[in-house]
Protein backbone atom coordinates (compact mmCIF):
# COMPACT_ATOMS: atom_id res chain seq x y z
CA UNK A 1 0.00 0.00 0.00
CA UNK A 2 1.24 3.46 -0.88
CA UNK A 3 -0.25 6.54 0.74
CA UNK A 4 0.26 10.11 -0.38
CA UNK A 5 -0.78 12.17 2.65
CA UNK A 6 -0.51 15.42 0.74
CA UNK A 7 -3.16 14.29 -1.75
CA UNK A 8 -5.17 12.22 0.72
CA UNK A 9 -5.08 9.22 -1.60
CA UNK A 10 -4.01 5.64 -1.29
CA UNK A 11 -2.96 3.31 -4.07
CA UNK A 12 -3.75 -0.31 -3.31
CA UNK A 13 -3.42 -2.99 -6.00
CA UNK A 14 -3.15 -0.25 -8.65
CA UNK A 15 -6.45 1.32 -7.58
CA UNK A 16 -6.64 4.96 -6.55
CA UNK A 17 -8.71 5.34 -3.41
CA UNK A 18 -9.47 8.89 -2.26
CA UNK A 19 -10.37 9.58 1.35
CA UNK A 20 -13.81 11.08 1.90
CA UNK A 21 -15.21 9.75 -1.37
CA UNK A 22 -17.97 7.33 -2.21
CA UNK A 23 -16.74 4.97 -4.91
CA UNK A 24 -18.82 3.80 -7.87
CA UNK A 25 -18.15 0.37 -9.33
CA UNK A 26 -19.64 -1.41 -12.33
CA UNK A 27 -20.02 -5.14 -12.89
CA UNK A 28 -19.74 -5.78 -16.65
CA UNK A 29 -21.23 -9.27 -16.20
CA UNK A 30 -24.47 -8.14 -14.55
CA UNK A 31 -24.71 -4.47 -15.48
CA UNK A 32 -24.97 -3.53 -11.81
CA UNK A 33 -23.47 -0.41 -10.30
CA UNK A 34 -22.64 -0.36 -6.61
CA UNK A 35 -21.46 2.35 -4.25
CA UNK A 36 -19.30 2.16 -1.15
CA UNK A 37 -17.08 4.25 1.09
CA UNK A 38 -15.01 1.17 1.91
CA UNK A 39 -11.74 1.04 -0.09
CA UNK A 40 -11.29 -2.64 0.81
CA UNK A 41 -14.62 -3.40 -0.87
CA UNK A 42 -13.40 -1.53 -3.96
CA UNK A 43 -10.23 -3.61 -4.10
CA UNK A 44 -12.14 -6.86 -3.50
CA UNK A 45 -14.71 -6.12 -6.19
CA UNK A 46 -12.03 -5.09 -8.71
CA UNK A 47 -10.26 -8.40 -8.07
CA UNK A 48 -13.57 -10.12 -8.94
CA UNK A 49 -13.87 -8.32 -12.28
CA UNK A 50 -15.74 -5.15 -11.35
CA UNK A 51 -14.63 -1.84 -12.88
CA UNK A 52 -13.90 1.03 -10.50
CA UNK A 53 -15.41 4.04 -12.28
CA UNK A 54 -13.08 6.62 -10.76
CA UNK A 55 -14.56 9.49 -12.78
CA UNK A 56 -17.94 8.76 -11.17
CA UNK A 57 -16.70 8.77 -7.54
CA UNK A 58 -18.12 11.62 -5.48
CA UNK A 59 -17.35 13.17 -2.09
CA UNK A 60 -19.69 12.18 0.73
CA UNK A 61 -19.66 12.12 4.50
CA UNK A 62 -18.71 8.92 6.31
CA UNK A 63 -20.48 10.15 9.42
CA UNK A 64 -23.53 12.21 10.31
CA UNK A 65 -22.87 15.92 9.78
CA UNK A 66 -25.19 18.74 10.76
CA UNK A 67 -27.94 18.81 8.12
CA UNK A 68 -26.91 15.55 6.44
CA UNK A 69 -29.16 12.55 5.90
CA UNK A 70 -28.29 8.85 5.77
CA UNK A 71 -28.20 6.89 2.52
CA UNK A 72 -29.18 3.26 3.05
CA UNK A 73 -27.84 0.26 1.14
CA UNK A 74 -29.87 -2.91 0.64
CA UNK A 75 -29.06 -6.17 -1.10
CA UNK A 76 -31.28 -8.77 -2.77
CA UNK A 77 -29.79 -12.24 -2.72
CA UNK A 78 -32.57 -13.27 -5.14
CA UNK A 79 -31.42 -10.86 -7.85
CA UNK A 80 -27.87 -10.11 -6.75
CA UNK A 81 -28.64 -6.38 -6.93
CA UNK A 82 -28.12 -3.55 -4.49
CA UNK A 83 -30.62 -0.77 -3.90
CA UNK A 84 -29.87 2.63 -2.36
CA UNK A 85 -32.28 5.10 -0.89
CA UNK A 86 -32.45 8.03 1.48
CA UNK A 87 -36.03 7.12 2.32
CA UNK A 88 -36.15 4.94 5.46
CA UNK A 89 -39.72 3.84 4.66
CA UNK A 90 -38.68 2.73 1.15
CA UNK A 91 -35.78 0.79 2.68
CA UNK A 92 -38.05 -0.98 5.18
CA UNK A 93 -40.59 -1.77 2.43
CA UNK A 94 -37.80 -3.33 0.36
CA UNK A 95 -36.88 -5.51 3.35
CA UNK A 96 -40.41 -6.52 4.33
CA UNK A 97 -42.11 -6.83 0.92
CA UNK A 98 -39.24 -7.74 -1.39
CA UNK A 99 -36.91 -9.67 0.91
CA UNK A 100 -33.91 -7.34 0.65
CA UNK A 101 -31.20 -7.51 3.31
CA UNK A 102 -30.66 -4.19 5.07
CA UNK A 103 -26.93 -3.38 4.94
CA UNK A 104 -27.20 -0.10 6.85
CA UNK A 105 -25.98 3.40 6.12
CA UNK A 106 -23.45 3.51 3.28
CA UNK A 107 -22.77 7.26 3.64
CA UNK A 108 -24.36 10.57 4.53
CA UNK A 109 -25.37 13.25 2.03
CA UNK A 110 -27.07 16.62 1.93
CA UNK A 111 -30.78 16.68 1.10
CA UNK A 112 -31.77 17.65 -2.45
CA UNK A 113 -33.11 20.99 -1.24
CA UNK A 114 -29.87 21.98 0.53
CA UNK A 115 -28.60 25.41 -0.46
CA UNK A 116 -25.05 24.14 -1.08
CA UNK A 117 -23.49 21.12 -2.72
CA UNK A 118 -23.20 19.36 -6.07
CA UNK A 119 -26.23 17.63 -7.56
CA UNK A 120 -26.48 13.83 -7.59
CA UNK A 121 -29.13 12.52 -9.99
CA UNK A 122 -31.02 9.25 -9.67
CA UNK A 123 -32.13 7.15 -12.63
CA UNK A 124 -34.11 3.93 -12.89
CA UNK A 125 -33.79 1.33 -15.63
CA UNK A 126 -37.25 -0.25 -16.13
CA UNK A 127 -35.75 -3.10 -18.16
CA UNK A 128 -33.46 -4.52 -15.47
CA UNK A 129 -34.94 -2.78 -12.38
CA UNK A 130 -31.70 -1.05 -11.42
CA UNK A 131 -31.13 2.42 -10.05
CA UNK A 132 -28.08 4.54 -10.75
CA UNK A 133 -26.71 7.74 -9.25
CA UNK A 134 -24.55 10.15 -11.14
CA UNK A 135 -23.13 13.62 -10.68
CA UNK A 136 -22.63 13.84 -14.44
CA UNK A 137 -25.52 15.73 -16.08
CA UNK A 138 -24.41 14.46 -19.51
CA UNK A 139 -24.66 10.84 -18.33
CA UNK A 140 -28.04 11.58 -16.75
CA UNK A 141 -29.36 13.11 -19.98
CA UNK A 142 -27.93 10.35 -22.20
CA UNK A 143 -29.36 7.51 -20.12
CA UNK A 144 -32.71 9.30 -20.10
CA UNK A 145 -32.62 9.42 -23.89
CA UNK A 146 -32.16 5.64 -24.16
CA UNK A 147 -35.01 4.64 -21.87
CA UNK A 148 -33.89 5.14 -18.28
CA UNK A 149 -36.43 6.98 -16.10
CA UNK A 150 -34.96 10.25 -14.84
CA UNK A 151 -35.96 10.62 -11.19
CA UNK A 152 -34.37 14.03 -10.64
CA UNK A 153 -31.95 15.17 -7.96
CA UNK A 154 -31.68 12.56 -5.21
CA UNK A 155 -29.33 14.49 -2.93
CA UNK A 156 -26.32 16.77 -2.89
CA UNK A 157 -22.69 16.18 -1.97
CA UNK A 158 -19.86 18.54 -1.01
Question: Could you say what each language-model-derived stretch is?
Answer:
Residues 1-158:
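Extracellular glycan-binding segments that recognize GlcNAc-based cell-wall polysaccharides
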Amino acid sequence: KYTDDELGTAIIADEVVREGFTYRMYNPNTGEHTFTKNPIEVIGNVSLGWNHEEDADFPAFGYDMDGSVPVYRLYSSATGLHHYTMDREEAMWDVEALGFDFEGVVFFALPADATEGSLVYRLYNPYDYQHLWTTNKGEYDYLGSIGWNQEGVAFKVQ
